[in-house]
Design a protein with these regions (language model features):
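Feature captures the FAD/FMN-dependent oxidoreductase FAD-binding
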Residues: 38-151
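Short acidic, glycine/serine/threonine-rich loops at helix termini
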Residues: 10-14, 96-98, 125-128, 153-157, ...
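Glycine-rich loop(s) and the adjacent beta-strand/alpha-helix scaffold that form part
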Residues: 144-196
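Short, small-residue-biased leader/transition segments that mark boundaries at the very start
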Residues: 2-7
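Conserved N-terminal glycine-rich FAD pyrophosphate-binding loop of Rossmann-like flavoproteins
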Residues: 8-30, 157
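Conserved FAD-binding subdomain of flavin-dependent enzymes
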Residues: 22-38, 180, 184
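Glycine-/proline-rich flexible loop or hinge segments
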Residues: 9-14, 51-61, 157-160
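Generic structural signal for well-ordered, non-membrane alpha-helical segments
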Residues: 18, 22-25, 63-71, 167, ...
Length: 198
């Protein structure tokens, strides 16, 4: 199976951005200087205003992307962003230390800044992540975007393949770390109907 570089720019499913449920999120990302809206403007093949028969409060713009071009454009953007270093590895474990290892004043400031988490009733400080290969990346905070990859499996008819979408590797170890940190896990099932080749 492949471990595709820069998976964060991939659009493996329905390649649209915006719409009724996610349009506000795209606008918030745009307001914060993010690239999603900018890149869809460069690569869309169709855009449509949804809910036009209703009031303006529920109007919502949705753009259909050329998913290959969107991926290439986003990858270019990421690779040319100053002060951004891209490392790729499968994370197996979130590393934390007890909050009481810092003095009380520091711990209080860090909790306010969102760098502290409560794990099994005890305040913990996130210090990094450990990869499957044993590498450690130290950090002050983690943004966790697992998508559909945690212990992923694809069902094709009666056949079960333990893999992520489109043959990409699943993240098979991170789930245990999240559970050990007191995070409750649920499995969601999505379905894609068979495509008819014209």
């Amino acid at each position: 199976r492949q471990r595709q570089m820069c998976i964060r720019d991939r659009m493996p499913c329905n390649p649209n951005i915006g719409g009724s449920s996610k349009g506000h999120l795209v606008r918030e990302i745009d307001a914060l200087g993010g690239q999603m809206g900018i890149n869809i403007d460069k690569t869309f093949i169709q855009s449509k205003m949804l809910n036009k028969s209703k009031g303006p409060a529920v109007h919502s713009l949705r753009a259909q992307a050329d998913k290959v071009n969107y991926s290439m454009e986003m990858r270019k953007t990421l690779q040319n962003t100053e002060h951004l270093t891209i490392r790729q590895a499968e994370v197996a474990e979130i590393i934390t230390v007890p909050a009481n290892s810092a003095d009380g004043e520091t711990a209080a400031v860090e909790k306010k800044d969102g760098q502290m988490v409560e794990i099994n009733g005890e305040l913990q400080k996130i210090t990094g992540v450990k990869t499957v290969s044993g590498g450690v990346y130290h950090c002050k905070a983690i943004v966790l975007c697992t998508g559909t990859y945690l212990r992923a499996r694809c069902l094709t008819g009666e056949m079960i393949t333990y893999t992520g979408p489109n043959g990409l590797m699943a993240a098979n170890h991170l789930t245990d770390s999240l559970k050990a940190h007191g995070i409750e896990m649920f499995r969601f099932k999505t379905g894609t109907p068979a495509r008819v080749d014209k």
